[in-house]
């Protein structure tokens, strides 16, 4: 069965070609070992001079380990699931206990660390028209479209998009998609983002999550993506999202006439591209976000969080942005004689700029959110499904703060185990 054939291969957007078995099993995973040569104190941005000479610190992690299961029922009906383990954790859920004077109660039973990130049923009517219903990946931005670790050179996911957008963005709803010639489209209706989960350090990133055992959907969100493949190995893409973020939490606060006119209109727009040639690969992205009524939303959140409500406490800015580009060259291409054609050794560089908090005129500024970052390193692929990664990165903050260099080593896999 075929779901999509993109220039940048994404396991979540493809299923294996025709085979004797109807079952598809696949997945991806990554391990990351990092040494950070800057302070890990939580006050390093509010009092940077006090932590300038702090010792380095190390962090070892398994950011993602994912299993895909797909099945072709026949006659155009297919299903797919994705189970993701993040950081080897379990997670927790929050409930509002009215038997305990309306206090918030934390229960260790469900959360974002072990998640069912996809679970959908699809009916394919034609290559140009397919319908999915269930829990879907929302392909807004280059990272959400191709979030598997062999689709970027860095040890960790591209930092700018990962900071300001939900990642991997998954939500429950319905999707219409298809491909005709050099074009592919997708339109989604999903549960809207929650403005009470927006914040200073990550913009709307946490807005797609839910601390409850259900996803609030008082407001709907609308997302779309269009891909163009003008020439071989090149993809150009536009994507975006719109929804109202206010009045989309629990309990429903629409009765509160004081804030009835506060909508929290949320607009996200993104452009991304990928060129994957025989020896040279380049990828890039540009993302922009807007939230109306940011000042009022920040005030409401601050008042709510004083009652231990499970919302983000810091203010959200009116805008956020991210832009990045990376390029890699296969050094083994210089030595064609006698080498294994399956192996690749990329020398790569990446630059990105992002700011998760661009305030409205009446909001305070927090300049540490304005960042540039460079990364250089190598990716060795002994097989097309496995990558060993090494990099040096340097995060540049404004002059009153301390810069943040680090070195990282990682290993990742991505592929189908059975078809």
Which residue ranges define each predicted feature?
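Cleavable N-terminal export/targeting peptides
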Residues: 1-17, 419
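Outer membrane beta-barrel
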Residues: 18-37, 55-195, 218-223, 227-236, ...
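Surface-exposed strand-loop-strand hairpins of Gram-negative outer-membrane beta-barrel proteins
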Residues: 18-22, 33-63, 203, 209-213, ...
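Outer-membrane beta-barrel pore domains
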Residues: 38-40, 51-54, 97-99, 104-109, ...
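Solvent-exposed loop/turn segments connecting transmembrane beta-strands
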Residues: 59, 86-87, 166, 216, ...
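Active-site rim elements
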Residues: 107-108, 163, 202, 209-213, ...
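Active-site glycine- and acidic-residue-rich loops that bind
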Residues: 167, 213-220, 261-265
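Loop-centered beta-sheet repeat module
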Residues: 197, 203-249
């Amino acid at each position: 069965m075929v779901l999509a054939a993109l220039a940048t291969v994404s396991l979540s957007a493809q299923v294996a070609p025709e085979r004797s078995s109807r079952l598809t099993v696949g997945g991806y995973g990554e391990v990351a070992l990092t040494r950070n040569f800057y302070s890990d104190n939580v006050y390093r941005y509010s009092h940077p001079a006090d932590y300038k000479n702090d010792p380095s610190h190390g962090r070892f992690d398994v950011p993602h380990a994912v299993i895909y299961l797909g099945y072709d029922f026949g006659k155009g009906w297919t299903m797919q699931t994705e189970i993701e383990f993040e950081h080897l954790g379990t997670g927790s859920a929050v409930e509002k206990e009215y038997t305990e004077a309306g206090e918030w109660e934390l229960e260790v039973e469900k959360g974002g660390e072990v998640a069912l990130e996809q679970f959908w049923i699809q009916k394919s009517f034609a290559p140009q028209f397919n319908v999915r219903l269930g829990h879907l990946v929302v392909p807004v931005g280059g990272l959400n479209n191709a979030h598997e670790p062999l689709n970027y050179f860095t040890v960790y996911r591209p930092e700018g998009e990962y900071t300001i957008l939900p990642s991997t963005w998954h939500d429950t709803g319905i999707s219409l998609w298809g491909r005709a010639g050099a074009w592919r489209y997708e339109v989604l209706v999903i549960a809207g983002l929650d403005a009470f989960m927006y914040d200073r350090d990550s913009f709307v990133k946490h807005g797609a999550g839910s601390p409850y055992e259900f996803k609030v959907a008082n407001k709907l969100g609308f997302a779309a993506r269009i891909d163009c493949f003008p020439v071989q190995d090149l993809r150009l893409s536009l994507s975006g999202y719109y929804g109202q973020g206010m009045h989309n939490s629990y309990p429903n606060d629409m009765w509160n006439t004081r804030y009835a006119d506060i909508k929290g209109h949320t607009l996200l727009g993104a452009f991304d591209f990928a060129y994957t040639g025989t020896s040279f690969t380049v990828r890039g992205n540009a993302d922009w976000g807007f939230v109306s009524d940011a000042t009022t939303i920040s005030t409401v959140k601050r008042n709510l969080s004083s009652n231990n409500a499970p919302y983000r406490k810091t203010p959200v800015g009116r805008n956020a942005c991210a832009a990045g580009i990376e390029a890699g060259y296969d050094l083994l291409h210089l030595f064609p004689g006698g080498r294994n054609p399956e192996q690749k050794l990329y020398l790569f560089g990446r630059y990105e700029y992002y700011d998760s908090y661009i305030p409205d005129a009446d909001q305070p500024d927090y300049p540490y959110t304005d960042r540039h970052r460079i990364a250089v390193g190598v990716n060795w692929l002994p097989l097309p499904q496995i990558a060993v990664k090494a990099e040096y990165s340097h995060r540049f903050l404004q002059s009153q703060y301390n810069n943040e260099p680090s070195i990282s080593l990682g290993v990742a896999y991505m592929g189908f185990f059975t078809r």
